[in-house]
Amino acid sequence: MGQPKYKRVILKISGEALAGNQGFGIDQEVITSIASQIKEVRELGVDVAIVVGGGNIWRGVKGSARGMDRATADYMGMLATVINSLALQDALENQGVDTRVQTAIEMRQIAEPYIRRRAIRHLEKGRVVIFAAGTGNPYFSTDTTAALRAAELEADVILMAKRVDGVYDSDPEINPEAKRLKDLDYLTVLNGGLGVMDSTATSLCMDNHIPIIVFGIKEKGNILKAILGEPIGTYVGRLE
């Protein structure tokens, strides 16, 4: 096995990825597989912090589109990410991986509050840290949370684990002729509406020179491939 290309990573796992083929809730096989892949990466000495989405349980944007107050809908989405984070923590600890959950909204009975220095210390001690409840503010996505935490923790890369295996020129689940894009620069993502991440998150990554790798989570071993720098999915960053 080769040497890891990245020393500290933010792994962004979409809520939809946790649902697997069932489309809603948490697929136990999927979350166990993800946990085993994270364990494999952690054993290489890579610092791993995780941001989990909540779309398998609730999506704030959809709630607000149906007439719900946007802030309320977003807070419900943040709570959905806490559910996912606790499930992932349990899956990791069942495999012997020391894990901490930190929430952007305090709920001390079930998790630590997010404290940057404490999170860094956990990583230095070899623990996996899961960041839940987004940024703690409505109107900000979990993609933006991933970009923000990557900047705060000086991560080398954001690994975006999704249901699809990269970024396409159109929706591959609708268009069978869609083509996967190998390399993109930030401005192309910002201007092209390619659905990598929202503009706030992309701008934050661009301003702080944080590359993004978008890949599919279904195939076991993909997280390790991304860590080792193998060509996988779509790379977003500054192109030479």
Curated annotation (Swiss-Prot):
Question: Which residues hold UMP?
Answer: 54, 74, 135-142
GO cellular component entries: cytoplasm
Keyword annotations for this protein?
Allosteric enzyme, ATP-binding, Cytoplasm, Kinase, Nucleotide-binding, Pyrimidine biosynthesis, Transferase
Metabolic or biological pathway: Pyrimidine metabolism; CTP biosynthesis via de novo pathway; UDP from UMP (UMPK route): step 1/1
Region: Involved in allosteric activation by GTP; residue ranges are 20-25
Q: What does this protein do?
A: Catalyzes the reversible phosphorylation of UMP to UDP.
The record's comment on protein family reads: Belongs to the UMP kinase family.
Mind telling me what this protein is named? Uridylate kinase
| Species lineage | Bacteria, Bacillati, Bacillota, Clostridia, Moorellales
